[in-house]
Amino acid sequence: HYWFDLNRDWLPVQLPESKARVKTYTDWLPNIVTDHHEMGTNSTFFFQPGIPSRVNPLIPNLNQKLTEKVAKYHANYLDKIGSLYYSKEDYDDFYFGKGSTYPDANGGIGILFEQGSSRGHIQNSQNGVLTFPFTIRNQLTTTLSTLKAASELRIELLSYMNDFYVNNFNDSRKSKFKGIGFGNNHDNTSSYELASILKAHKIKVIETDGKKFKYFVPLQQKKSKLIKAMFDTQTKFEDSLFYDVS
């Protein structure tokens, strides 16, 4: 894909797969999204929450608490099959262009899974021989634990999503900032492309007369949190480190 990681493309939606994926996501608006990946062979199995000090400030605290509740199901299921695992290390919840973080700006719970890779059928590791069937078993097991968590926590998850959108809409209505204007008649192409990206996320974009700006994005709409995630400039951080967002 021209050296561009599909799992950084959830916000810019430049590749065909990303456009289809974001459209499907927006149509369904899931309560939980699982994002399955592989990591270095000598690692075991990771599931979120990630490093607590590296959570994007726009993500509600309740999101992380629900992620921890779901994590207990993963731990329980992996304990039953004797698989090693860890959490709250290595990975974070900061960049919204990843599959495990994009849901956090849309009222859902995004969960990253990272499995130590067998790099094919079988590989020696610091933890012993690692086989491809073993890695698949861990990924499948945490898929089933997620389904169990979604079923048993459904009331909390549904309430969270409802409150997420109600609170964001009310905050936008009370805010002195009513929207974001961008573009002009001297830069039609880039302005059009940015507007197209926003529309791909089902964000309302109004085309103006172009005297001051070409497009206007009102904050008082369903996707207000996602708009802030895309346009806000965050300059204060609890941690100085971040997982790769390139």
Task: Go through the PLM ranges and name each one.
Residues 8-9, 14-16, 20, 24, ...:
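Intrinsic-disorder/low-complexity accessory segments
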Residues 38-40, 116-117:
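Short glycine-enriched loops at secondary-structure junctions
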Residues 25-39:
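Proline-aspartate-enriched helix->loop->beta-strand connector
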Residues 1-8:
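Divalent-metal coordination cores built from histidine and acidic residues
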Residues 39-43, 189:
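Active-site environment of divalent metal-dependent phosphoester hydrolases
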